[in-house]
């Protein structure tokens, strides 16, 4: 597993812990603004992990495909993901 994937995995594990904490906050009847702030933090961690995975994809999968002469498929995949990100 390369460094980007290791970092993405750690970010996802952190987000999972944050989400578990958010669930507990809701169950405990905690203040809504505090819950909302934690949701933003978990969301940011998920976005970070996605960026790391896309970085890994560009640095390895897309580069390898381009060297083998079929990089346009991989580029189209990345454009599809970026379109989803920008539409939100």
Features from the language model and the residues they span:
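Solvent-exposed interaction patches of small proteins and small membrane subunits
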Residues: 1-88
